[in-house]
């Protein structure tokens, strides 16, 4: 179990709800993933599934904690207004804060992000800021009152994995008491393992599951990957060596010669 913003959870995998082929695929993937937290955008237009249920009706059946986001916002004012609407609509003070500054790589706008985070925290929100792995930006967000950081592994939807493991490892070292969750860029289960082996608290992903050939099966794979990576970190991985080291100790006399000499 671990604590995320006051909620006791067993799964360290957070999953998005966009881009699935159908509501049925989304529901099955979320079920298979074992996640207890799903992200949703209030700017999403509701759509009917194969069985005629709306997106919102389908979400209610999942019995997960909701993490609304401010996707599509370009400045602090828009993000703050969206967060207030989300709090009213979903009855939660959680908000995944996204303020995008570039259309090419969907990189966060750092100045507006910090501004929005500070105001929202003052208004009683638990802010989950989507940010880059920049150490100074993350420090400013912590100074603003953020108890959670969600740095990217790579640009949203790129599937490139961890493009700067050193920067992420540095964040873990510098912020030992901050909840760190990788958000964006994860493309395959091995990336999730790598994240958790660095000591991160969780992984948030969407596209890697939603656009897989078999979303439900991929969700299962990510479920096990996150568990494996976390257990590897807790178990204490051996250090790398520059030279070989035999796993079986050698002695001068083979054991069968020793037996014959008895």
From Swiss-Prot:
Pathway: Cofactor biosynthesis; thiamine diphosphate biosynthesis. It is an enzyme of class 2 (transferase). One of its GO terms (cellular component) is cytoplasm. 1-deoxy-D-xylulose 5-phosphate binds at residues 157, 184-185, 206-207. It comes from the Bacteria. It catalyses: [ThiS sulfur-carrier protein]-C-terminal-Gly-aminoethanethioate + 2-iminoacetate + 1-deoxy-D-xylulose 5-phosphate = [ThiS sulfur-carrier protein]-C-terminal Gly-Gly + 2-[(2R,5Z)-2-carboxy-4-methylthiazol-5(2H)-ylidene]ethyl phosphate + 2 H2O + H(+). GO terms for molecular function: thiazole synthase activity. Its EC number is 2.8.1.10. The keyword Cytoplasm applies. GO terms for biological process: thiamine diphosphate biosynthetic process. Homotetramer. Forms heterodimers with either ThiH or ThiS. This is Thiazole synthase. It comes from Legionella pneumophila (strain Corby). The lineage of its organism: Bacteria, Pseudomonadati, Pseudomonadota, Gammaproteobacteria, Legionellales.
């Amino acid at each position: 179990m671990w604590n995320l913003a006051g909620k006791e959870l067993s799964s360290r995998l957070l999953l998005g709800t966009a881009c699935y082929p159908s509501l049925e695929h989304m529901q099955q993937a979320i079920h298979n993933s074992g996640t207890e937290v799903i992200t949703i955008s209030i700017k999403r237009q509701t759509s009917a599934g194969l069985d005629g249920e709306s997106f919102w009706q389908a979400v209610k059946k999942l019995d997960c904690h909701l993490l609304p986001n401010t996707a599509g916002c370009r400045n602090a004012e828009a993000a703050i207004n969206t967060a207030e609407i989300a709090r009213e609509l979903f009855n939660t003070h959680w908000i995944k804060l996204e303020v995008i500054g570039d259309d090419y790589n969907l990189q966060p706008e750092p100045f507006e992000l910090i501004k929005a985070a500070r105001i929202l925290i003052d208004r009683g929100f638990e802010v989950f800021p989507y940010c880059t792995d920049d150490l100074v930006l993350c420090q400013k967000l912590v100074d603003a009152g953020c108890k959670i950081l969600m740095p990217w592994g790579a640009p949203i939807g790129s599937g490139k994995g961890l493009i700067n493991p050193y920067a992420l490892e540095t964040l873990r070292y510098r912020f030992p008491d901050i909840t760190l969750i990788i958000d964006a860029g994860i493309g395959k289960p091995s990336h999730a393992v790598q994240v958790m082996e660095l000591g991160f608290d969780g992984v948030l992903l969407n596209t890697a599951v939603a656009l897989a050939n078999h979303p439900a099966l991929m969700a299962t794979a990510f479920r096990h990957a996150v568990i494996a990576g976390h257990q590897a970190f807790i178990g204490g991985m051996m250090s790398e060596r520059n030279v070989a080291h035999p796993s079986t100790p050698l002695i001068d006399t083979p054991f069968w010669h020793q037996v014959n000499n008895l």
